């Protein structure tokens, strides 16, 4: 039996109510977590489809089970659309997450114990770029590079000098909290100069790359990985791209049977439909508006001397704000904003002095509010509400004013049209 909503509600009221509460939370909150977005109803329909029933170990035309002709069509659609979007010769759409995509990329390029250079977490890198608590830092000998302490920008001369000293087998570029343009051609020059491979994790900026609004790493990286959510606005999952046929074979083997069994074909279907949306000209307009809204919010903070934007501004979908002149730390800021229905996350800043559980900063992203069709005016209003909240944390009357203003915005821009 395939449940409709009424069946579901009657069968498992506890779960139904929990999901309904999350829908209400998303509708009534302003979502600024940079890694989150709002998918289309088509993406949700594909992910909730009957494809969830089908096991399909292997790849199109090379499965270990029968009855896979239809899912072969689904997965091939996703593969071909991904290749078209990013101009890549090969694509693997099976990774369950960006972390698993990164794991498979490492397995395809290097051996355990090899030296790798990745961006320091506080400078904007990701856990899988060598953090000691991650499989990456435990399996490989990661050496971190950082941003310049004064400009808070990537210093390619310093990165080259460091690479010449440590002689890595692999250099990882890409970030989870870096608000400026990344020059992947310079990373490739450095990699070539020291005989290293280059891997790029473009998870955060993939949607901007797809829209032609950020330089693509695909022509320069030996392997490019990404998530399929964030700015790409698809389901939660991973994607691996390469132009090298031999590496493509290694990637496929690393994913299956290396670290995964059967692919989640319902999620692959959701990736396929989201890729079709990315190929629509409207997506480029969306991505352009994401950057405009990010800049609009950042400009409000730049005008207030009590806040400091890391690296001085933004050229993408996110930026970091040092809040320590106004509140104790980023965790306090995050919790205060939760109370007025504005959701974002505490975040370490370059050369952080506080623990990652407290942090000096917060990270603000524009992807989700732009999906709700907030414009630059609304984005500036959101930034003003954040500042108002943090500067009036003990004034309940002011906080109630903020809650009302948030409600006006979320009512005016519903999560989904009925």
UniProtKB/Swiss-Prot annotation:
Keyword Metal-binding appears in the UniProt entry: no
UniProt xrefs under PROSITE patterns: SHMT (PS00096)
One biological-process term from Gene Ontology? tetrahydrofolate interconversion
Known EC number(s)?
2.1.2.1
Q: Which reaction does it catalyse?
A: (6R)-5,10-methylene-5,6,7,8-tetrahydrofolate + glycine + H2O = (6S)-5,6,7,8-tetrahydrofolate + L-serine
Alphabetical list of SUPFAM superfamilies matching this protein: PLP-dependent transferases (SSF53383)
Requisite cofactors = pyridoxal 5'-phosphate
For this chain, the annotated S-S bridges are none
Q: GO molecular-function annotation terms?
A: glycine hydroxymethyltransferase activity; pyridoxal phosphate binding
The pathway it acts in is: One-carbon metabolism; tetrahydrofolate interconversion; Amino-acid biosynthesis; glycine biosynthesis; glycine from L-serine: step 1/1
Question: One GO term of the cellular component aspect?
Answer: cytosol
Q: Where is this site: Plays an important role in substrate specificity?
A: 229
Primary location: cytoplasm
- Subunit details: Homodimer.
The entry assigns this protein to a family as follows: Belongs to the SHMT family.
Q: What does this protein do?
A: Catalyzes the reversible interconversion of serine and glycine with tetrahydrofolate (THF) serving as the one-carbon carrier. This reaction serves as the major source of one-carbon groups required for the biosynthesis of purines, thymidylate, methionine, and other important biomolecules. Also exhibits THF-independent aldolase activity toward beta-hydroxyamino acids, producing glycine and aldehydes, via a retro-aldol mechanism.
Q: What is this protein called?
A: Serine hydroxymethyltransferase
User: What's the source species for this entry?
Assistant: Streptococcus pneumoniae (strain 70585)
The organism's taxonomy opens as: Bacteria, Bacillati, Bacillota, Bacilli, Lactobacillales
């Amino acid at each position: 039996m395939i449940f409709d909503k009424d069946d579901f509600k009657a069968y498992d009221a506890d779960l139904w109510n929990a999901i309904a509460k999350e829908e209400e939370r998303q509708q009534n909150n302003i979502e600024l977590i940079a890694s989150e977005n709002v998918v289309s109803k088509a993406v949700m329909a594909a992910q909730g489809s009957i494809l969830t029933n089908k096991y399909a170990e292997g790849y199109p035309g090379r499965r270990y089970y029968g009855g896979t002709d239809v899912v072969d069509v689904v997965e091939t659609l996703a593969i071909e659309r991904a290749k078209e979007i990013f101009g890549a010769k090969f694509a693997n759409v099976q990774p369950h997450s960006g972390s698993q995509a990164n794991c498979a990329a490492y397995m395809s390029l290097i051996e355990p114990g090899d030296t790798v250079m990745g961006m320091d977490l506080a400078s904007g890198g990701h856990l899988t770029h060598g953090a000691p608590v991650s499989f990456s830092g435990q399996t490989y000998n990661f050496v971190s590079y950082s941003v310049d302490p004064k400009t808070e920008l990537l210093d390619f001369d310093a990165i080259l000098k460091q690479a010449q000293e440590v002689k890595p087998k692999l250099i990882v570029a890409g970030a989870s909290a870096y608000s400026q343009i990344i020059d992947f051609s310079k990373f490739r020059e450095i990699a070539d100069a020291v005989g290293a491979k280059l891997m790029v994790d473009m998870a955060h900026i993939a949607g901007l790359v797809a829209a032609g609004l950020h330089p693509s790493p695909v022509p320069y990286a030996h392997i490019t990985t990404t998530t399929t959510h964030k700015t790409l606005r698809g389901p939660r999952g991973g994607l691996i791209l390469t132009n090298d046929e031999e590496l493509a074979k290694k990637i496929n083997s690393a994913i299956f049977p290396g670290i995964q069994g059967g692919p989640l074909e319902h999620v692959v279907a959701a990736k396929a439909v989201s890729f079709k949306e990315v190929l629509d000209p409207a997506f480029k307009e969306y991505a352009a508006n994401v950057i405009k809204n990010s800049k609009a919010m950042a400009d409000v903070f730049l005008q207030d001397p009590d806040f400091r934007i890391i690296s001085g501004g933004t050229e993408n979908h996110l930026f970091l704000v040092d809040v320590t002149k106004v509140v104790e730390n980023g965790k306090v800021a995050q919790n205060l904003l939760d109370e007025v229905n504005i959701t974002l996350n505490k975040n370490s800043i370059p050369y952080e002095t506080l623990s990652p559980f407290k942090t000096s900063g917060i990270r603000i992203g524009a992807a989700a509010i732009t999906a709700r069709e907030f414009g630059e005016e609304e984005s500036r209003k959101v930034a003003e509400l954040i500042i108002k909240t943090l500067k009036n944390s003990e004034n309940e009357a002011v906080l109630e004013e903020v809650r009302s203003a948030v409600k006006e915005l979320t009512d005016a821009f519903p999560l989904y049209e009925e």
